[in-house]
Design a protein with these regions (language model features):
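Active-site and donor-binding regions of nucleotide-sugar-utilizing enzymes
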Residues: 43-138, 143
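Short alpha-helical segment that forms part of, or immediately flanks, the ligand-binding pocket
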Residues: 231, 249-255, 274
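Acidic donor-binding loop of glycosyltransferase active sites
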Residues: 235-245
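Donor-nucleotide binding loops and adjacent catalytic segments primarily
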Residues: 166-237
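A nucleotide-sugar donor-handling region in carbohydrate enzymes
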Residues: 121-178, 206-207
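A short alpha->beta transition loop at the rim of the catalytic pocket in nucleotide-sugar-dependent
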Residues: 237-238, 256-258
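C-terminal "capping" alpha-helix adjacent to the active site of nucleotide-linked donor transferases
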Residues: 277-298
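Conserved N-terminal ligand/cofactor-binding loop architecture of enzyme catalytic domains
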Residues: 2-73
């Protein structure tokens, strides 16, 4: 969208906009559940997928804050890339009769009812399989565009797909997703450190605790926090090890770099990993740490 000269784009973090005083606590609680109680998260995720009643955020306070945003921005179109955002805007449209088109950009390769809303005007589906699922849920074929998962322009540039020149040193890029979480990172880095001719780059995202723990630990391991220039590091990698987030998978697909997904444990990430393995652009290590250590040695 930013490449369109006539378009003015305003990006909003809806959680922060709607709940400015508690958004950090909500995010922290979610992160704690994912890191320590992911079994509960997966149970809730699966159960919500079986519910016939559509769950939407409602309430006078929510509508009041959304009205303030709409009145201030006067958008010609609303694009949502997160299920909570989809449900909130759909609920507001239903309540107020807002006519502004709602575009739902699905950023998981697996389908869940959290993405569907009758007030959505256009769906951007990552795959044909997702389009068929949306049609089963009642969406019209003409309202669904199969676009893949959109990635930033830096991943579409021609030089992003240039192969790295081979030398004696192999470079491994490790990423833990938006939360900066990676299973068994200690064992993984120790193994890579012990392998001759291997350098590693770890991107911890906004996980400051992980950054402080690993920065300057090994001279052959570069540790970075949040960076906007992910494509540069993917372009320079011989192998990427990461979580199976939908956007990340499509970024790696555009970068044409070999991919390892280690022990996906969140339900939607497991579904994403299965898709990547079936399509042949990722090696998924489902089991014990010994399994991926053996794969690294090959």
């Amino acid at each position: 969208l930013r490449s369109l000269e006539q378009a003015e784009i305003e990006k909003k973090d809806l959680l922060e906009e709607l709940y400015p005083h508690i958004s950090k606590f909500i995010f922290g609680g979610f992160r704690m559940m994912v890191e320590h109680c992911y079994g509960i998260y997966n149970f809730i995720y699966k159960m919500s997928g079986r519910m016939k009643v559509e769950m939407r955020p409602r309430g006078k306070a929510l509508y009041k804050r959304l009205k303030k945003i709409m009145d201030g921005e006067q958008p010609d179109v609303i694009v949502c890339t997160h299920p909570m955002c989809v449900k909130a805007i759909a609920s507001y449209k239903e309540k107020t009769g807002l006519k502004t088109p709602l575009v739902t950009c699905i950023t998981d390769i697996s389908m869940h009812p959290e993405w569907t809303a009758s007030q959505t005007d256009i769906y951007l589906a990552p795959t044909q399989e997702i389009k068929r699922h949306l049609m089963k849920e009642g969406a019209r074929a003409e309202d669904i565009l199969v676009t893949g998962i959109p990635v930033r322009q830096q991943f579409l540039d021609a030089d992003c797909r240039q192969k790295r020149e081979r030398n004696r040193t192999r470079r491994v890029l490790i990423m833990g997703g938006g939360l900066g979480l990676m299973p068994d990172l200690k064992e993984l880095l120790e193994k890579l450190h012990s392998m001759q001719g291997v350098e590693s780059v770890v991107i911890t995202g906004k996980n400051h605790k992980m950054y402080e723990e690993w920065v300057n630990r090994y001279e052959d391991v570069e540790v970075l926090g949040y960076t906007e220039n992910i494509s540069r590091y993917m372009r320079g990698a011989d192998l990427v090890i990461t979580k199976a987030g939908g956007i990340t998978l499509f970024e790696i697909l555009h970068s044409q770099v070999p991919l390892f997904v280690i022990h996906p444990f969140l339900e939607q990430e497991m579904n994403n990993a299965r898709y990547a393995a079936e399509k042949g652009f990722a090696k998924v290590i489902w089991g014990r740490r010994e399994d991926y250590i053996q794969e690294l040695e090959k």
